A protein has these predicted regions:
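Extended aliphatic helical segments
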Residues: 16-19, 122, 169-170, 194
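Short beta-strand-initiation
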Residues: 120-122, 179
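Short, solvent-exposed loop/turn segments at the edges of secondary structure
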Residues: 118-120, 186
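Short consensus segments that form the blades of beta-propeller domains
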Residues: 113-114
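An internal, acidic/charged active-site-proximal segment
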Residues: 144-200
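Dynamic "connector" segments at or just before major functional cores
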Residues: 1-107, 117, 124-144, 150, ...
């Protein structure tokens, strides 16, 4: 379960990872030597989470991904009075230097950092015009850009139903196939994209 200690661990972990972008091992060292993040949440200047708790935290947070994203979206919408009239879709990938033998999604694919020797995962994001992430998906490393969009559009339709003032979906040329553009229209949205073909 989530007791006070695990909540303090999660919040401290997120702050240090966001500020410094280190590994879990480096996060633990920074917490002990160069950060008051742990004291900020626990109220105890001598408290630091154990290294094993830090390694386990990403998996524990990922189990709550859907409700966490929904809560963060609702909170930012209310706080900043956001209407989410524009939805930007984008994909990127990241590589692993280890073998990732136990992963069912890590695959060899087209690395944006030219690391053809490493397995990849693809991160798909839907972002509003204010820059807040509406939702995210982790896809297989060899997922092609066009094939990733239908699932994202379905999620958008579920979480942000079309209204009289239609949401504008912004996508890049890598995703804008005729089938995908048709799917966007069928869901009741407008779209803006770079054409994959010359104007006729």
């Amino acid at each position: 379960g989530w007791n006070d200690n695990s909540i303090h661990t999660a919040l401290s972990h997120l702050i240090v990872r966001t500020v410094y972008s280190p590994s879990e091992w480096a996060t633990h060292r920074i917490m002990k030597e160069n950060s008051a993040a742990c004291e900020l949440y626990s109220g105890n200047p001598d408290w630091t989470p154990g290294i094993n708790a830090l390694y386990q935290m990403p998996d524990r947070l990922f189990e709550l991904k859907e409700p966490l994203e929904r809560h963060l979206c609702n909170t930012t919408d209310h706080l900043f009075n956001i209407d989410n009239r524009i939805a930007l879709f984008d994909l990127t990938n990241f590589y692993f230097e280890g073998r990732k033998a136990g992963s069912h999604k890590a695959r060899f694919g087209r690395s944006k950092e030219k690391r053809s020797d490493c397995k990849l995962l693809v991160l798909a994001l839907c972002i509003n015009r204010e820059g807040f992430i509406r939702y995210s998906s982790i896809l297989e490393g060899n997922a092609s850009d066009p094939k990733s969009l239908p699932d994202m559009i379905d999620k958008l339709a579920e979480k942000s139903p079309a209204t009289n003032e239609k949401t504008l979906v912004v996508i890049d040329a890598g995703i804008s196939t005729e089938d995908n553009l048709q799917r966007i229209k069928e869901k009741g949205y407008n779209y803006l994209c770079v054409s994959r073909t010359r104007l006729k």
